[in-house]
């Protein structure tokens, strides 16, 4: 009986139907970018200082320039050490409405030295130096409440983590198409609700909900396209589907520049996603899933439609189509199986560390550049562009060099770039951006390639479980990354870079402990997985990119 791949060889492995479905589903991949890293623009923290009653009126009466107003009325400007905290979170305890204040150095009549004047925390809000708005400026998430910005982004990654626990079941139980449509609808609704949230708490809950379903939408699209194409195109299609995410990043920079108000920006990236619901009429259910549910008639009908669109003739035995037999799947996997043998234990722990470290590096560099860049939009745009050559490097090296050395080298490059950024003076901003781009390119390569290696190191019956458990560390890394970046920057701006450098260099070193899987057949049993790297397999190399997983990172 012909398998799905056998039938695809007759009706077209990547014909007009697959190309159309690929382009449509890539739009879903691109739409995840504002959710994944939108914090850079939604949570942008501009220069700010305490609002003091009477200062604006005095400034107008005296005809001060903005720089003179700051110099006369804000403490800590130009000082070292705690200057940033003083100027942004403290104010002089002065009644600026009193008529005795002079227009030239008004505080000189109150104290010979400004440092002797008493200070107090901001009581009347803040003044922000920005033409637009962000969640920071609207909800005053600065000073003592600055950690709430970190929590906003952490909720997205927490949603990714929680969603990955149930999305797989929904997709397997009710179908890939239904999962795609339902998660897309909830993603769109929660995105709009985030934009109109009246307070911080409700905004946080809607953001968490959006994280829980948006990853499911991305994974469902990934699953559908990899199940529609033939095995020879599966790897390239999977990589290009992730490149669509990069297109979303590049586009996000332009949209954010055009719409500086965070609520309108959130609406601009959320409302168009309602159009994805039209996929109900354009994207069919996966024939593989239909066969797994014994719905052969529907699977055959879809294959006939694919053949018609591709102008191919379906095989005569199409109605006898079946799934590939895999006796190993009858064995029930358990978490303990991931640590059952010495090699499996080593592989699992290393893969967990790789997923965690590359997530911290990838998201951390994006946030650090956003917080320290001279031009937020251009820096984000340039650093996003480097993900295109990253995908090209993967396509070129994956079958020529292998997996392990490119992953190790990319980690080492990312780590070294972060450490070098510490020694670059602020005046050489272009060099800092260049190194940040280099580090991000390395992290991108690791994120995409570790997914492939993860699938190739485990035996068949625990391959899905191994991917779900290990890649969950990617979401956990994303939960902690905002706190690592923004809180450590309060201590020393370069401190997160030291952490990134250590993570990258150590990840590169431990990667070399993994066996090379290039040219080696996928292991079917624990014994074969245990012996990976100890012998050369003469079996035909597996050409499938990976088995579709529901626990993988949204960027991988």
Curated annotation (Swiss-Prot):
Phosphorylated. The modification Phosphothreonine is found at residue 543. The modification Phosphoserine is found at residue 334. Phosphorylation of the transporter leads to changes in its substrate affinity, resulting in a regulation of the transport activity. In contrast with rat ortholog, ASP uptake is inhibited by protein kinase A (PKA) and C (PKC) activation. ASP uptake is also endogenously activated by calmodulin, the calmodulin-dependent kinase II and LCK tyrosine kinase. Inhibited by cGMP, most likely through a cGMP-binding protein that interacts with OCT1. Its main location: membrane. One of its GO terms (biological process) is O-acyl-L-carnitine transmembrane transport. Residues 1-21, 172-177, 232-238, 285-348, 399-403, 453-465, 515-556 are cytoplasmic. InterPro entries: MFS_dom, MFS_sugar_transport-like, MFS_trans_sf, Orgcat_transp/SVOP, Sugar_transporter_CS. Signal peptide: none annotated. Changing residue 36 to C: Decreased fenoterol uptake. Decreased fenoterol affinity. No change in trospium uptake. No change in terbutaline affinity. It is a multi-pass membrane protein. GO terms for molecular function: (R)-carnitine transmembrane transporter activity; acetylcholine transmembrane transporter activity; dopamine:sodium symporter activity; identical protein binding; monoamine transmembrane transporter activity; neurotransmitter transmembrane transporter activity; norepinephrine:sodium symporter activity; organic anion transmembrane transporter activity. Expressed in kidney. Expressed in liver. In liver, mainly expressed in the central vein. Expressed in intestines. Weakly expressed in adrenals and in lacting mammary glands. SUPFAM superfamilies: MFS general substrate transporter. Electrogenic voltage-dependent transporter that mediates the transport of a variety of organic cations such as endogenous bioactive amines, cationic drugs and xenobiotics. Functions as a pH- and Na(+)-independent, bidirectional transporter. Cation cellular uptake or release is driven by the electrochemical potential (i.e. membrane potential and concentration gradient) and substrate selectivity. Hydrophobicity is a major requirement for recognition in polyvalent substrates and inhibitors. Involved in the uptake of clinically used drugs including diabete treatment medicine metformin, neurotoxins 1-methyl-4-phenylpyridinium (MPP(+)) and iobenguane and platinum-based drug cisplatin. Metformin competitively inhibits OCT1-mediated thiamine uptake, leading to a decrease in hepatic steatosis. Plays a role in the anticancer activity of cisplatin and may contribute to antitumor specificity. This is Solute carrier family 22 member 1. It comes from Mus musculus (Mouse).
